[in-house]
Amino acid sequence: MMIEPLYDFSLTAEQEARARTLHESSIILDMLFQGPVGTYSLPEGAEEELLALAQEACPGDEIAQCNWATAEILRRMIGVSYSQLYKDCWYDSGLTGGCRQLSVTDRDEALRSAVELQAEFDTYPWLVKCTSVEQIRRCKKEGLKAGIVTSQEAEGYSKDLKLLELLYNYGLRVQQLSYNNQNLIGADCMEPNGGAGLSKFGIRFVEKCNELGIVVDTGHCGYHTTMDACKYSKAPVIASHTGVEKVNFHARCKSDDEIRAIADTGGVVGIFAMPWFTGADPENTTVDDFIDHIDYVVRLVGIDHVGIGTDWPMPQTKWAAITFKKYVAPTIGFAPGNGPSTEWIHGLKDYRSFINVTRGLVARGYSDEAIRKILGENWLRVFEQVWKK
């Protein structure tokens, strides 16, 4: 439960004070927010307790034990036992808001997921399902937290645009076109040679997102699907959580062409904090490496087109993360050796360390206005342009 020490940026006392003021006063949004509770903020003894309970519930089945433990953490976060932990971790992070994810692997799962997510909103009076920028700004002003409903999966739509309308009416405001596998819309980044572009249905899907006011997200999309999304969308396109190929070459990172195409739509590239995608050595990746990706996007396309989408850490135990990486990740499109595990970015081990992002941006010499844009204002500009009033 201990928060890691502040990362050493060698800031002066004046810079530390400036970073603290910026962190407290800015709207900070994480558009792939897996928190607020992560692996290293679980209560003392939780690892052992959850392992014993998972083994009892799912004897002899490591994958089932992993899934059970992760689901149990989520149950506890909307129950009594972790409710205070959930609130404390979110408020200690300084984040104004972040995504709350729907699972759209099929229609039934989408509806089940919506019920589960609604329970999260209903449990916490300080957590607001936000569908407008005005609501997000009000959350900041009133000391509340903003939940933005998003989905990474799109295979569950099949060719059912009515399901997209249904989920929009529920509150969905950001939709990724593909995860780690090809679907009827387009291709993921793990397909060879950049995968296929948008299908005819995929073009209609993008047009429907534009019509409804749903942000088109290309975070996991392959090269050609990303480029097509930018070509056919009449509204800003984002990559909610990705990295820069020129900083760390990996399939999950975007090329200069993709970053430029997203920026040309008026969109934003969100930088993730996943150690095995961010730096060459996952064991020794730091918040400085994370900020290197931000710096590159700023140099390439300007300060208005970069944001944050950490995607890490996950709300799971260390042993479940190891099991997930070994057995589950390969089944959902991750390359061998990739996927959630026990590594962390030094300086971002926990969401409660999020001030290190602001401190790092101060250390790199960004102005107050630029830092506020990176932390959240760029996302808000896109939402203002896309979301219907």
Give a label for each model feature.
Residues 1-193, 249-389:
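N-terminal hydrophobic targeting/anchoring segments and the immediately downstream early-domain regions
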Residues 155-158, 166-253:
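Divalent metal-binding pocket/active-site signature
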